[in-house]
Amino acid sequence: TASFGVNWDDISADQFAEEGTVTVNGTADVLGDEIPVSATIRVQTEQITVGSSVSGKVMNLTQSIPEGEQSDTLSAIVDGSTTISDNTSGGANPTAWSNWQSSQNGNSKAEITFEYATQQRLGQIVMHFAKDSGSMRYPDAGTTEILVSEDGTNWNKLAVTETIGEESGRVKPYTYDFTPTTATFIKFKLTNASASTGTGWKPCTALTEIELKVAQGSF
């Protein structure tokens, strides 16, 4: 069999903006003769489903709080467990991260950053916030910001829809839905609850897990 080069007519992205069939015309040089040819392209909308969490595959997990003011266990938010222990033995709670010490020092904000070895395509994020009888309080609605980056320097804020779930075992899920996006770095900007705790302690924020769920596409 022989193959011949084809010169295709110019096409624009607008021709593929809607589902359907697009015909592209061109000409092939067949042994010196210009032969008209055409190709039919089927255009479909990608169907997105939300897959499993890739939080546990994070390469670097960091927080903005200086080492001397860090509280509880940062790695707990990627261990796959959303529950919080009573931690009756004292010391750092191994099942949650918090900004307790930093908050008591007067800082109401904190950041947590995920860095991956390769780009991730995300479709949903679920943050599991925790509460206790002392300082831990659920954040106010609409105060958590999520930013994404490919290089860790230039950041874009995600436009999200926040849904606050029901409390179970002192943990409440905050689900963030958004248009599927790619990122190598994901940053969370956290702000403590505004209301007083009524306990003498300043409010702080605690997390048992952050689920970064992949977006899976199919046609």
Predicted regions: what they are:
Residues 91-154, 170-219:
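Aromatic, loop-rich ligand-recognition surfaces of beta-strand-rich domains
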Residues 4, 28-30, 41, 78, ...:
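Short stretches within intrinsically disordered, low-complexity N-terminal or propeptide regions
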Residues 157-166:
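Solvent-exposed serine/threonine-rich low-complexity stretches and specific carbohydrate-binding patches
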Residues 1, 19-20, 79, 169:
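Solvent-exposed, conformationally flexible loop/turn segments
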Residues 2-43:
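Serine/threonine-rich, repeat-prone extracellular segments and beta-strand-based repeat modules
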Residues 47-91:
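Predominantly extracellular/luminal regions of secreted and cell-surface proteins
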Residues 42-49, 215-217:
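Extracellular interdomain linker/stem segments of modular secreted and single-pass surface proteins
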Residues 12-19, 46-51, 68-71, 96, ...:
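Short, surface-exposed linear segments at secondary-structure transitions and domain or protein termini
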